[in-house]
Amino acid sequence: MRIAQHISELIGGTPLVRLNSVVPDGAGTVAAKVEYLNPGGSSKDRIAVKMIEAAEASGQLKPGGTIVEPTSGNTGVGLALVAQRRGYKCVFVCPDKVSEDKRNVLIAYGAEVVVCPTAVPPHDPASYYSVSDRLVRDIDGAWKPDQYANPEGPASHYVTTGPEIWADTEGKVTHFVAGIGTGGTITGAGRYLKEVSGGRVRIVGADPEGSVYSGGAGRPYLVEGVGEDFWPAAYDPSVPDEIIAVSDSDSFDMTRRLAREEAMLVGGSCGMAVVAALKVAEEAGPDALIVVLLPDGGRGYMSKIFNDAWMSSYGFLRSRLDGSTEQSTVGDVLRRKSGALPALVHTHPSETVRDAIGILREYGVSQMPVVGAEPPVMAGEVAGSVSERELLSAVFEGRAKLADAVSAHMSPPLRMIGAGELVSAAGKALRDWDALMVVEEGKPVGVITRYDLLGFLSEGAGRR
């Protein structure tokens, strides 16, 4: 009889599936390694086994111990799945951008989940890295796998993922494409494929725009489980031959296309990897065989990527899940009012109240965001907002001096609304807010007010 003794015995051996509809004519063959068919639903199952076994062997993890790990969800599921059989408790620390769906999965496996802010530096006491370190110090018998520095992560992909790809393609693979998060997958599987092919296989990393791997400064992005704002020890930068930066917008759109056109319900980092793989396939030509690793499934993203309202709120929505078309949008209102305005009228926390009032008056606007970088900025880099009325009142009432920093007198950030949302949604939001910050593809692009909406409607909403 063929009966596994535990679900963890079924980790690995995931299939390759050819992509068809999303691949352009004349491009190379693109085969997806479908890692969501692991029992825990992701490629992180592989590293969980290796890390726990190594910790047990070294004595770092003792019977009845507690596993503490900062994770975007998938590593936690893999660790919980293996730990459950071996009697360990699990405490996982997640950034707040991780979907509630994914957090609930961890809880379902019996883990405790601690949520921390995303938009803070790695060494900030509130970051999910720092909080996990503190928990390890505070909990007796705690062990932190630290997937970002644990050599067993890359090793697991070197001994399983890489050999599986080589065997299943009969050594004909020409390119391997994978997203870079901790760096373990591309380091381990990529190193194996380079070695076994004598350097013939080209290794390509896919990375979110803003991540350090592709030359960014670690600026915020919304795709989960990939990219970083620091350099993990598990990542070997000598392995990838090329790294392709992919926007959140392109990643999410491809993720939705994979469900509609390829019947693959996968996560956002999978869409990102496929965007990069298709670029490689077009450049490599029809004789190439590109293997792209799809690390997880899409059921943990139903409230985000596969939710039209969430996609629209960030300005990512290109087509609705039901295929319906939209009428006049918030983006139309912004384009109608913009005229000669710069891309985003803004000020910075370090600028003075005098500077901010001058900017508001120069461009004839009543409110603007306070941002921590120069445009184009990400939504997570918006620190607050200022209005001409509030600043002038503060100055005349003696609560503010013109030489004060804006940071001392700014209000909370304006409510965000996606450029693709309907004008009716803006009308409802403006009942409670004087102004709204418009975001497109996750980036703030302007501000609309009640006055702007009334002007748009009075001039004829249908005129574009």
UniProtKB/Swiss-Prot annotation:
Coiled-coil ranges (or none): none
An MF annotation (GO) of this entry: cystathionine beta-synthase activity
UniProt modified residues of type N6-(pyridoxal phosphate)lysine: 44
EC assignment: 4.2.1.22
Family: Belongs to the cysteine synthase/cystathionine beta-synthase family.
Gene Ontology biological process terms, A to Z: cysteine biosynthetic process from serine; cysteine biosynthetic process via cystathionine
UniProt-annotated binding residues for pyridoxal 5'-phosphate: 74, 269
Any one GO CC term of the record: peptidoglycan-based cell wall
Record's keyword terms, sorted: Isopeptide bond, Lyase, Pyridoxal phosphate, Ubl conjugation
Species annotation: Mycobacterium tuberculosis (strain ATCC 25618 / H37Rv)
Name assigned to this protein: Probable cystathionine beta-synthase Rv1077
Cofactor(s) required for function per UniProt: pyridoxal 5'-phosphate
Keyword Lyase belongs to the record: yes
